[in-house]
Each structure stands twice: as structure tokens, then as C-alpha cells.
């Protein structure tokens, strides 16, 4: 009897104290804020967590393997990519090509070949029970083969069709209900939409083939990508299921959403708080951490200045202070290069959020009940903003035609039409009404994979 109890205790300890390697190479705050919350949850639950990251934090409860130089590399990549962008910042579906995305894949390869990661790989004493990889890069699936471990793919936002196909998703592609998240134009004819879907599928297949070739070059790995993908047992998607149009998925695909959200605080900046308390209707405008407003073409910037100066409301605008050197900014507009966005959105005087449509910004706006005007610029932002209008929680503006889109009119509409605020508050209640919070759900299903990895592989 004692031996049985001891063996059971050891088994539980093995599950609760697994060695987990997380590979999260994208040097973007919007990605890393999600992954950091997940990593912390794993560690606090008793797991030994090692993370390969280009953006280390001042923490000691996880082992961080810093992939050197990638932030600098990423900044240069963004800077050099302006040649493919419209109006200085816009990367729509026409820019999604194998050639354009190879810079990002090379960035990841650069990280994996960095000294610290190389040292990790050369240490033959390292053993991992589970690999958790960022979902959109297939190159890093090689860690599953290196350590002979099961893999969870984790997307900080929406998942791409190829992710669903990896875990056997039967509804990976549906150009009407579940369009490819790289699409930006949803007004085309049915035939044109199918052509765009096929084009994106082919470009991504070329990109995956190139990653396969890189693995042969960098690791001597001579198997095809399908064999690496066969180790993937679970897919985490960090958006609420309703935003992905309630896709019919199996148990090995789990929607999360908002796992980075922390309890908002009172705005601490006294100057900012004074401005916010003085004005009772405030529009907050931010295009996220990855977009520099000053990279927009001159006419775009001038139109934003015109609109913000002219509307009868106060404006908080995330933009570098150097904008004042070329433009006359009205006293109703308060500019800063950074805002405590979570806290700002929770202030009762914020009535409209002008956003690029990033997933994390959307989570924060929904949680705070602030209607949005989405001005998508790249990636999944176009699809995400499309959902604003479909769910009745905001409006969209085409940045390529900003001057004709009537941004000032749409701002006034959101301020005065209370249906947007009502809808977004209802949506927040609906999303929040779950038996388990998203971060705890992610932990439970991570442990589920650790407990049942052999059975999942057999019966998937």
C-alpha cells in the first residue's frame, strides 16, 4: 500500500514539475506580453520553465535563454520593409509573399543560431517533457525532434490555416466564414476571394518548403515538415472563439483570449490624469507598439492632425513628440510617445478608441467597454477590424483612403450612438462568462498534454 501511494505521489510530482521549453522568438511586445503571462503561470504552478526569447525580463522564476541581437535585427527588418508598404506603413494581402516573409524566418533562424541558444542545444544533459512553440513559424518545430518531446503550438493572436491543418482541423479553410487571416479585402466577388485564398495558400507553402530546406542546412534534419508537425498535439489560440466566428474545432484546439489582461490601475501620471479629468469625452488614438506614426506618408499624418484638431473632444494620441516640429497641434490634443493603455482605456472619460486593430488592444478595449474605430495596417488586423463591424462594437476605416473615409464623422457617431457601447459591454459579459479563466485554461490543457501525450498521439 505504501509503495502504491509513493508511486502515485511521484507520478503527480512528475506531472506538476515538468521540464518545459518555450520557444517564443518574435521580438514584439504584443506577442511577448501574452507569452510572458503564460510562462509565469506555468512557473507558479510548479513547472521548470526554460524560454528562448529575444526580450528578456527582470525575473528569476524562469530560465531565460536570450537570443542575442534579434531586437536590433527586427528593427532593421521593419525599417527596410517600407519599400513594400503602402502609404509608408500598410502591408495588406498583396504583400504576403514568400520573399517578403523570408526576412522574418531568417530573423528566427538568426536567433536559434545565437550563442546562448547554441549553448543550450550543445548541453546534452538538457531534457524536456514538452515544447511550446510560437505557432506561425514552422522552423522552430525542430525542437520537438531534438528533444523527442510533444509540442504545443501557441498563437498570440489568430491562428493561420496551416495551424489548423497541423492538428487535424476540418474547418481550416472556408473563404466565407473563416477567411485566411492574412486577407485584407473582403469586398471582392466570390471568385476573387477564392483566388486570393489560393494565392495565400501557395505563398505559405513556398515559405514552409524554404523552412524545410533551412532545417537541412542548419541542423542536418532531412525529414519533411509533416514529420515535425506530427508531434504537435495541441493548438492554443489567444482570441475569444466568437472573434473567430465560433469555428467548429476539436478538443486539441483551445481558444483563450485576453490572457495578458491584468487588473487596471488608476492613471499615475499626474499631468496625464489632470488632462483626462478636465475633459469628459476623450478619444484615445494608438496604433500599437509596432507602428511609428511618423513613418506614415505626409498626407496621412496631416489628415490625422486635421481631424484631431477639429473634433469637439479631447484626444490622447500616441505619437512621438517630434510631430510638433512640423504640425500645429491643438490644445485639445495631448501627445505622448507611450501611454499606460490598459489604465487609460479603463478611465470613464474614454469614449472612443482609434486602433490599428491588434488583438491585445482589442482585448483591452472589450474588457473596458470602449467602442473602437479600427484602422488596420497589417497582418490579422484587417480581419479583426472586420469583426468590429459584424459584432456592432465599432467601425472600420480604410487607411489607404483616409481622406475620403470621414474619420471625424465616424468618431462623432461612436460618441453619440450608444448602441456601440451597449454591444461591447454585452460582448465583454458574454466572453467573461466562462467556468474557467483563459490563463487557467491554458495551464490545465498544458497539464492535460503532459498527462495524456501518448493517448493524444494515438487517438488524435
UniProtKB/Swiss-Prot annotation:
Signal peptide range: 1-18
Q: Does the keyword Signal apply?
A: yes
- Record's keyword terms, sorted: Glycosyltransferase, Signal, Transferase
In terms of InterPro entries, this protein maps to: Ecdysteroid_UDP-Glc_Trfase, UDP-glycosyltransferase, UDP_glucos_trans, UDP_glycos_trans_CS
Enzyme Commission code(s) on record: 2.4.1.-
Single GO MF descriptor: UDP-glycosyltransferase activity
Q: Which chain regions cross the lipid bilayer? A: none
- PANTHER family from the UniProt entry: EG:EG0003.4 PROTEIN-RELATED, FI06409P-RELATED
Role of this protein: Catalyzes the transfer of glucose from UDP-glucose to ecdysteroids which are insect molting hormones. Expression of egt interferes with normal insect development and block molting.
Similarity field: Belongs to the UDP-glycosyltransferase family.
Q: Name it.
A: Ecdysteroid UDP-glucosyltransferase
Q: Which organism is it from?
A: Lacanobia oleracea granulosis virus
Q: Which lineage ranks, top first, belong to the organism behind this chain?
A: Viruses, Viruses incertae sedis, Naldaviricetes, Lefavirales, Baculoviridae
Amino acid at each position: 500500500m505504501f509503495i502504491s501511494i509513493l508511486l502515485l505521489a511521484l507520478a503527480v510530482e512528475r506531472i506538476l514539475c515538468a521540464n518545459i521549453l518555450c520557444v517564443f522568438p518574435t521580438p514584439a511586445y504584443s506577442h511577448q506580453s501574452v507569452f510572458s503571462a503564460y510562462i509565469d503561470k506555468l512557473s507558479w504552478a510548479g513547472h521548470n520553465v526554460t524560454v528562448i526569447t529575444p526580450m528578456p525580463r527582470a525575473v528569476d522564476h524562469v530560465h531565460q535563454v536570450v537570443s542575442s541581437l534579434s531586437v536590433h535585427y527586427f528593427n532593421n527588418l521593419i525599417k527596410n520593409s517600407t519599400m513594400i508598404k503602402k502609404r509608408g506603413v500598410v502591408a495588406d494581402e498583396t504583400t504576403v509573399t514568400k520573399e517578403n516573409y523570408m526576412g522574418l524566418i531568417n530573423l528566427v533562424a538568426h536567433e536559434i543560431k545565437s550563442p546562448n541558444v547554441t549553448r543550450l542545444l550543445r548541453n546534452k544533459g538538457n531534457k524536456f517533457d514538452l515544447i511550446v512553440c510560437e505557432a506561425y513559424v514552422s522552423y522552430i518545430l525542430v525542437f520537438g525532434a531534438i528533444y523527442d518531446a510533444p509540442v504545443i503550438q501557441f498563437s498570440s493572436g489568430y491562428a493561420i490555416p496551416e495551424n489548423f491543418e497541423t492538428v487535424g482541423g476540418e474547418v481550416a479553410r472556408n473563404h466565407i466564414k473563416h477567411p485566411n487571416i492574412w486577407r485584407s479585402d473582403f469586398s471582392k466577388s466570390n471568385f476573387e476571394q477564392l483566388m486570393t485564398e489560393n494565392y495565400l495558400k501557395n505563398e505559405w507553402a513556398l515559405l514552409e518548403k524554404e523552412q524545410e530546406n533551412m532545417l537541412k542546412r542548419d541542423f542536418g534534419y532531412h525529414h519533411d515538415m509533416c514529420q515535425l508537425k506530427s508531434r504537435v498535439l495541441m493548438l492554443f489560440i489567444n482570441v475569444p472563439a466568437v472573434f473567430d466566428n465560433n469555428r467548429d474545432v476539436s478538443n486539441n484546439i483551445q481558444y483563450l483570449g485576453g490572457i495578458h489582461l491584468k487588473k487596471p490601475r488608476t492613471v499615475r501620471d499626474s499631468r496625464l490624469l489632470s488632462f483626462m479629468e478636465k475633459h469628459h469625452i476623450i478619444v484615445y488614438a494608438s496604433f500599437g507598439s509596432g507602428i511609428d506614426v511618423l513613418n506614415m506618408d505626409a498626407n496621412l499624418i496631416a489628415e490625422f492632425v486635421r481631424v484631431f484638431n477639429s473634433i469637439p473632444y479631447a484626444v490622447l494620441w500616441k505619437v512621438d513628440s517630434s510631430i510638433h516640429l512640423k504640425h500645429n497641434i491643438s490644445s485639445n490634443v495631448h501627445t505622448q510617445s507611450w501611454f499606460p493603455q490598459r489604465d487609460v482605456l479603463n478611465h470613464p472619460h474614454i469614449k472612443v478608441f482609434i486602433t490599428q486593430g491588434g488583438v491585445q488592444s482589442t482585448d483591452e478595449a472589450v474588457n473596458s467597454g470602449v467602442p473602437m474605430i479600427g484602422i488596420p495596417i497589417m497582418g490579422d488586423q484587417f480581419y479583426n477590424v472586420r469583426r468590429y463591424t459584424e459584432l456592432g462594437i465599432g467601425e472600420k476605416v480604410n487607411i489607404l483612403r483616409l481622406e475620403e473615409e470621414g474619420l471625424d464623422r465616424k468618431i462623432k457617431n461612436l460618441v453619440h450612438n450608444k448602441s456601440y457601447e451597449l454591444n461591447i459591454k454585452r460582448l465583454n459579459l458574454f466572453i467573461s462568462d466562462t467556468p474557467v479563466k483563459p490563463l487557467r485554461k491554458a495551464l490545465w490543457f498544458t497539464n492535460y498534454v503532459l498527462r495524456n501525450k501518448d493517448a493524444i498521439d494515438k487517438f488524435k
